[in-house]
Amino acid sequence: MADVVITNGTVVTMNDDRELIEDGAIVVDGDEIVDVGPTDRIDEEYTATDRIDASDHAVLPGFISTHVHVSGILLRGLGNYRNLYDWLLNVKRPGTSAMDAEDHAIAAALYSAEALSTGLTTFVENATGSGGGYDASLLEGKFDVYDAAGVRNIYAYAFADKAPSQEFVESASDIAMREPEVNHVLPDETVADTQEALDTVESLIEQYHGTADGRQSVWPAPYLATIVTPEGLAGAYELAEKYDVMTTTHTAEDAYNEQSRRLSSVEYLRNAGYLGDRALLGHCVQVSDADIRTLAATDTKVAHNTLANCALGAGIAPVPTMVNYDVTVAMGTDNVPNSDSVNMFKDMEFAAHLHKGHNRDAGAITAEKVLEMATIDAARAIGREDSLGSLEAGKLADIVLVDLDRISLTPRTYLPAALVYQTTGCEVDTVLCNGEIVYEDGRVPGLDGLYDDLQSTAAEASANVIDRAGLGSQRDRTWTSINE
């Protein structure tokens, strides 16, 4: 007897043939998918403890976001109309620095709830909050929340072992002058010792990687090419190889970092021994064709944060060119205060339209490719293609049910396109992760025991953080038709 059988749905398998099974069914036993096929056959061959009727539903693999920052969700709404470093120095760093361990745990709960409600079951959390260092209470508080919620979290522990340039330090002070009321935490020459940083990452991998029934992972994450030494980069990649994990870093997000270097970030990472099939580069907005060829030749993966990059005015990553060179590109949802949501449907639609307009080519990217970038390509980007990203026997049971009986989805001429162009995320009504139902009827049952009212708790925590950080004037701003 199986644990769960899902029947009567349209199964969007994302397998090698990209098979769509009308009136399809999925059999789940434990944390694994054991069979996928037509409902008639599955009904004849299997009994189950629980049966889910997916009539008028699309059944998808759980979405994977390959680049996120979690704690900033409590700063939602404060990032509007600010370029990257204005936002980073005058909003994010002050805000996250004002958070204590409980605030971070609340943020993790809110993030997990919103992620699951829109079908996002796996996310790579870039842990790049201000101050650096290892805070055990912060980390364990977050991990406890992720475990309770039932999400699949990849904690990419960040470090910087190289001081920023004096030019950048001075520029940061100039940028901070815009907001004199803010309690700034500006960059300085304080850096981690390379070996100590690598030792910390290794100890975290040994302690936490594979916990929470395999849903918790830990990666090494050198913060940014400009503030990590070649030794730090090479050491991170070696750790990834040693522990059979991936490693990730922010790369070529804005023009400043590229213009201030003799080498491009991609060239520097290549020369330092960081590129390869275990490397996932976040952003890659300011990259050349030569950089893209290097990414392709080394099988280096890219996380595309389309909404966040545009919200910050950072630019548009040349994704169609990357795809044409066979670079694995996956979707990322990045910082919540940039896009103000945790919603892969929103990011997919934006990406699908953005590259058409930017390239003046309606065929620059397809809805199908964007759907791949949120599922099977994303699984490949995080080194989990063998276990995630598609609905196939032998893979982990991360499954999303999308209600198609909606006005906005009527008519739906072609389902893959409708899922990208006509779906907003509110149509998700059931989510399984690791074979367990983690979202149903508008609730994340695993979080019920942690917070009586998560929304009220998060709103109160956000207000307190904003006050402590001196961000009140940004919260209480007036109507703005033309930004200063």
Predicted regions located by residue number:
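Glycine-enriched alpha-helix->loop->beta-strand junction motifs that scaffold or abut catalytic
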Residues: 240-246, 274-277, 294-303, 324-329
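Alpha-helical scaffold segments that flank or form the walls of functional sites
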Residues: 79-152, 198-211, 455-463, 467
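Active-site microenvironment of metallo-dependent hydrolases
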Residues: 1-24, 28-30, 39, 45, ...
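His/Asp/Glu-enriched, well-ordered alpha-helical/loop segment
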Residues: 271-278, 320-406, 414, 423
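Active-site gating loops and adjacent loop-to-helix segments of metal-dependent hydrolytic enzymes
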Residues: 74-104, 162-190, 255-276, 298-301, ...
